[in-house]
Amino acid sequence: MLNIEFVREPYRTYLKKYIGKLISLEDVKAILLFGSLAEGKPKPFPESDIDLLVIAENLPENPVERRLKYLPLKNGYTIYGDIWLTPRELEEAIEGGWGVILDALTFGVKIYDPYKILEKASRKITQYHTRIGKIWRKKKL
């Protein structure tokens, strides 16, 4: 069962269709919803986009190729704003303090995480960073 019942329609319908396609891909290991939909503050449809963090194996190195590879899954809809990372890139993003990813993991909603990648990543944030207001500060290790 997907954890998306809290998402308002028609966003939920679009999210459900896209998530269904994503989890059918063998390389997709985790999906996180973040941004206004995850926070329960979407603008009227279609002003908000559906922000997703997708963790997958075997992604193209080139960011443009990466986006083009999965573009057909969107059926031409521009409502999806997704970030695709490998598990290793996710670790590097946390260690390096990529604010968007730190915020996504802290305030987002885990939609699909059978391998506990997002769960482990969320716990790792506090190992490396402290949040002061809206700013992430790297801890001295």
Identify the function of each model-found stretch.
Residues 1-27, 38-46, 57-141:
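Catalytic core of pol beta-like nucleotidyltransferases
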